[in-house]
Curated annotation (Swiss-Prot):
Stored HAMAP family: Lipoyl_synth (MF_00206)
Swiss-Prot/TrEMBL cofactor(s): [4Fe-4S] cluster
Residues that coordinate or bind [4Fe-4S] cluster 2: C87, C91, C94
Transmembrane segment boundaries: none
Cellular localization per UniProt: Cytoplasm
Species this protein is from: Rhizobium johnstonii (strain DSM 114642 / LMG 32736 / 3841) (Rhizobium leguminosarum bv. viciae)
Protein family: Belongs to the radical SAM superfamily. Lipoyl synthase family.
GO CC field: cytoplasm
Gene label: lipA
UniProt-recorded name of the protein: Lipoyl synthase
Length: 323
């Protein structure tokens, strides 16, 4: 059940996670030293925040409570979250607010494009909340944002991180036709966790979505990510890798799950840096072009640098195949 938030009266007190309010508080584990990050205080961070606020934009960096916000914003990197800040899903791991979203902001595509140009981004990541309330799941809005960025900053490469467009016929095809450079859709966790961690989604639908992207455009880079520390077994992670390689996914990210509040799914374990390195080694052996695996890895962390490495890895693979 999703409790409807008051989107009419802006002064009304908003409960960020109404669907989780009835849950008992979970234990919060002390973070190990390898998880700790510095508080964001730099000039670059302040400048990025000012640009975001000026254009009335939402970032997943803020809404999801990303631990890398200080580092990324200092470098003028930000992941823009389109279609509002209220999601129609209620995933147990996510800090984004749940409820009934507002109407789409028709000026948002141009505002995002202006911010991208002002920040001088060579690579931009665009994500969104789930919009199950929209007939196309927000596909047309994604398309408009991509077009606006192309018009304002033709040299900027575009990476999108999309919802699953569950039960939205034609939505995926429309987004792929807009020609983003990277199509990312996160699996989030292993299939055995879906009922408790990602109840509104379907594991094999997400695998099929990524596979379908390659069928529609074999040249488009595809990417997916998972969190570990949610009680998964190692063999489940390895099977997920196999499922993604069957779908011809190019890039895999693996990061540590961090619990936003006591009402969210608890951290079952803190995976060690050595274990992350092991996952990276195995993933490369399975054929991924790029793997980012570390405690603080997130989907869009170092996205620009990773895109350059991803493109180079494909070129190297093609050259080796031609020899």
């Amino acid at each position: 059940m999703v409790t409807i938030l008051d989107t009419i009266n802006p002064d009304a007190k908003r409960v960020r996670h109404p669907e989780k309010a009835h849950r008992p508080d979970t234990e919060v584990m002390r973070k190990p030293d390898w998880i700790r990050v510095k508080a964001p205080t730099s000039k670059g961070y302040a400048e990025t925040r000012a640009i975001v606020k000026e254009h009335k934009l939402v970032t997943v960096c803020e809404e999801a409570g990303c631990p890398n916000i200080g580092e990324c914003w200092d470098k003028k990197h930000a992941t823009f979250m389109i279609m509002g800040e209220i999601c129609t899903r209620a995933c147990a791991f996510c800090n984004v607010a749940t409820g009934k979203p507002n109407a789409l902001d028709m000026a948002e595509p141009e505002n995002v494009a202006k911010a991208v140009k002002e920040m001088g981004l060579s690579h931009v990541v665009i994500t969104s909340v789930d919009r199950d309330d929209l007939e196309d799941g927000g596909a047309e809005h994604f398309e408009k944002v991509i077009w606006a960025i192309r018009a304002a900053s033709p040299m900027t490469t575009i990476e999108i991180l999309t919802p699953d467009f569950l039960k939205k016929p034609g939505a995926l095809e429309r987004v792929v036709a807009a020609k983003p450079d990277v199509f990312n859709h996160n699996m989030e966790t292993v299939p055995g966790n879906y009922l408790t961690v990602r109840p509104g989604a379907r594991y094999f639908h997400s695998v099929r979505l990524l596979q379908r992207v390659k069928e529609l455009d074999p040249t488009m880079f595809t990417k997916s990510g998972i969190m570990v520390g949610l009680g998964e077994e190692r063999n489940e992670v390895l099977q997920l890798m196999d499922d993604l390689r069957t779908a011809d996914v190019d890039f895999l990210t693996i990061g540590q799950y961090l619990q936003p509040t006591r009402k969210h799914h608890k951290v079952e374990s803190f995976v060690t840096p050595d274990e992350f390195k092991s996952y990276e080694t195995v993933a490369y052996s399975k054929g991924f072009l790029m793997v980012a695996s570390s405690p603080l890895t997130r989907s869009s962390h170092h996205a620009g640098d990773d895109f350059a490495r991803l493109r180079a890895a494909r070129e190297k693979k093609l050259l080796m195949a031609a020899e």
